[in-house]
Amino acid sequence: MGSATPSRLQKFPATAPADEIYAAFKEDGCVIIEGFVPPDQMARFSQEIQPAMEKIQVQVTNDGNSNDRVKRFSKLVTTSPTFRHEILENDLMHELLQRVFSKPGEGMGYHFNDTMVIEVQPGAPAQRLHRDQELYPWWNSMGPDAPECLVNFFCAVTPFTVENGATRLVPGSNRWPELTLINATDCPQYGKIDSVPAIMQPGDCYMMSGKVIHGAGHNATLSDQRRALAFSTIRRELRPVQAFPLWIPMQIATELSPRTQAMFGFRSSTQHCDVDTVHFWGNDGKDIGEHLGLISSA
């Protein structure tokens, strides 16, 4: 049985070698990367989405719902030029995702599942502990040695503190012998799970496996809105939460780099099967980007 008492969150600067960050991720299932997004980029991004955030009504439900006093906004790529031209062009993110999802010679083995701003309001209750891979219910049943299905980069837009609801993580829960739902019926450790708060400054992020137990903390402040930017990525074989190509206008898509176009589903990925090459999300055996008239990424 895995330990229910984590000791720490490993931290690395964004300038650290990707192999070192990835090794910590493999060990604990989560790792903090300091300076993942430059603070000036994050400040401009926050300003650009502010009008949209102000239009979202706060729900007060008191029923354990994950949206209780939490604002969520996903139309980032169409709202923020800084997001689509700068933040998305994060080479370290791709270096790490290549190590998690991709095989040599097969291009990107991953795409975006969702990109979202999550703002925890004053008084918001703690979120129930969960694993993100519960989105794909069968994945837990494959155990800790299964390939990753989902990796989240969760970035601080405003400071993350214990008081304002910093995410609480359970390092090492990715390696528990049984990956279960976190409830009294399914989880032997239920009620005995200790967690570690992800204390971060704007621009820092934690990279987290879909296998790791976590949940937003209680925002006990009177006025502090804890804002985060989350990149949820999944292996290319899985269907994403967001139907990006159906609501991102082509005018916006053509502004994106070929790499980012692929992340949002405007280009195909390839896999070599014996002697054949398969295009995922393709068009009659060809890259969907050709059908859309996008400039070749070659």
UniProtKB/Swiss-Prot annotation:
Multifunctional dioxygenase; part of the gene cluster B that mediates the biosynthesis of austinol and dehydroaustinol, two fungal meroterpenoids. The first step of the pathway is the synthesis of 3,5-dimethylorsellinic acid by the polyketide synthase ausA. 3,5-dimethylorsellinic acid is then prenylated by the polyprenyl transferase ausN. Further epoxidation by the FAD-dependent monooxygenase ausM and cyclization by the probable terpene cyclase ausL lead to the formation of protoaustinoid A. Disulfide bonds: none annotated. It comes from Emericella nidulans (strain FGSC A4 / ATCC 38163 / CBS 112.46 / NRRL 194 / M139) (Aspergillus nidulans). The keyword Kinase does not apply. Fe cation binds at residues 130, 132, 214. Belongs to the PhyH family. Disruption phenotype: Impairs the synthesis of austinol and dehydroaustinol. This is Multifunctional dioxygenase ausE. InterPro entries: Phytyl_CoA_dOase-like (IPR008775). Residues at positions 150 and 232 are important for the type of reaction catalyzed, using identical substrate. Both ausE and prhA accept preaustinoid A1 as a substrate to form divergent products through dynamic skeletal rearrangement. AusE (containing 'Leu-150' and 'Ser-232') first desaturates at C1-C2 to form preaustinoid A2, followed by rearrangement leading to the formation of the spiro-lactone in preaustinoid A3.
